[in-house]
A protein has these predicted regions:
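Long, contiguous binding/interaction regions
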Residues: 2-36, 40-61, 65-88
Length: 88
């Protein structure tokens, strides 16, 4: 596990059964509603970027995974979306 800047961590990730690298970051919130609103904002950024993260939503916690599935690795698209998410 390596830090990839801005508290994003690099992990091995198996979203479709194949190993690849991904950036991951957890975001904490006061309640489910705040977490859901954040997920919706991330979704808007993802649509604009044409690059879609994997997102886990639970009470007060959002976990975001960024990887470029077609390349099976972390690319500039992931780093750029991570920076945009950090600005929310």
């Amino acid at each position: 596990m390596n830090t990839a800047g801005n508290n994003w961590e690099e992990f091995d990730y198996f979203p479709d059964g194949r190993e690849q690298k991904a950036l991951r970051k957890d975001f904490t919130f006061n309640d489910f509603q705040d977490a859901l609103e954040f997920v919706n904002k991330v979704g808007e950024l993802a649509e604009k970027a044409g690059h879609h993260p994997d997102i886990n939503l639970s009470w007060g916690l959002v976990r975001v995974w960024l990887t470029t599935h077609s390349k099976h690795k972390i690319t500039d698209k992931d780093h750029n979306l991570a920076k945009a998410i950090d600005q929310l």
